[in-house]
Amino acid sequence: MADQPQETTDFGFRTVARDEKQAMVADVFHSVAAKYDVMNDLMSFGIHRIWKRFTIDCSGVRRGQRVLDLAGGTGDLAAKFSRMVGEQGQVVLADINDSMLKMGREKLRDRGIIGNVNYVQANAEALPFPDNYFDCITISFGLRNVTDKDKALRSMFRVLKPGGRLLVLEFSKPLLAPLSKAYDAYSFHVLPKIGELVVKDPESYRYLAESIRMHPDQETLKGMMGAAGFDNVTYFNLTGGIVALHRGFKF
């Protein structure tokens, strides 16, 4: 009997076995974790802070609520949510990568944020939380690294409370051709050089550029969220569509 063909997925522009991608992505983030915040500021000229602020403003989070910051990395969103939910609320900073989770924990504790934030190493495709548990879920620059995005979106839908909302902040497709060309030149020629200088790892930032190009565009991701069960899915193009914030509700 012939062997079954192996399922594949993308890792940047490469095609790899589905069961290998998770480990390959993990290697990338183990490599860059220590300089992740510095690189974010350098790569985006600090604009990532504005994108994240807009995400916070669209969250509708209130005191006493429960928030999941998925692929939360070094905790930029979790820190702000911690103040918003107050002592009676809860923020769960979850990341599949233990190096990133460690950096987030250390960063928030150094800032005195300790009372209402929990840290969980979790795979977005199989979230270890009860049904209807969170009032709000955010995933910031993480969905494109997930192997099975549809499965992850369904998992997020399951753990979100009725009336809750999901916010997906992610790189997307620039709206104008000249901007797209300039962005490509920057991504494929400048980013790897910055990665080499700061992290000594140009390949991880070459993967970053490639993973952005392979990520679903605005309308495709909107359709995926709808297929996962989310209602009233909309998106906001930021910085000319270089980044988009998708928002969907569970009713």
Swiss-Prot record:
Enzyme Commission number(s): 2.1.1.163, 2.1.1.201
GO BP annotations, alphabetical order: aerobic respiration; menaquinone biosynthetic process; methylation
Pathway where this protein functions: Quinol/quinone metabolism; menaquinone biosynthesis; menaquinol from 1,4-dihydroxy-2-naphthoate: step 2/2; Cofactor biosynthesis; ubiquinone biosynthesis
Similarity comment: Belongs to the class I-like SAM-binding methyltransferase superfamily. MenG/UbiE family.
Top-rank lineage group of the source organism: Bacteria
A Pfam match: Ubie_methyltran
InterPro entries for the chain: SAM-dependent_MTases_sf, UbiE/COQ5_MeTrFase, UbiE/COQ5_MeTrFase_CS
Transmembrane segment boundaries: none
Protein's job: Methyltransferase required for the conversion of demethylmenaquinol (DMKH2) to menaquinol (MKH2) and the conversion of 2-polyprenyl-6-methoxy-1,4-benzoquinol (DDMQH2) to 2-polyprenyl-3-methyl-6-methoxy-1,4-benzoquinol (DMQH2).
Signal peptide: none
Entry keyword set: Menaquinone biosynthesis, Methyltransferase, S-adenosyl-L-methionine, Transferase, Ubiquinone biosynthesis
Record GO terms (molecular function): 2-methoxy-6-polyprenyl-1,4-benzoquinol methyltransferase activity; demethylmenaquinone methyltransferase activity
Record Gene3D superfamilies: Vaccinia Virus protein VP39
Gene that this sequence comes from: ubiE
The protein, known as: Ubiquinone/menaquinone biosynthesis C-methyltransferase UbiE
Residues annotated as binding S-adenosyl-L-methionine: T74, D95, N123, A124, S140
Reaction(s) catalysed (UniProt annotation): a 2-demethylmenaquinol + S-adenosyl-L-methionine = a menaquinol + S-adenosyl-L-homocysteine + H(+); a 2-methoxy-6-(all-trans-polyprenyl)benzene-1,4-diol + S-adenosyl-L-methionine = a 5-methoxy-2-methyl-3-(all-trans-polyprenyl)benzene-1,4-diol + S-adenosyl-L-homocysteine + H(+)
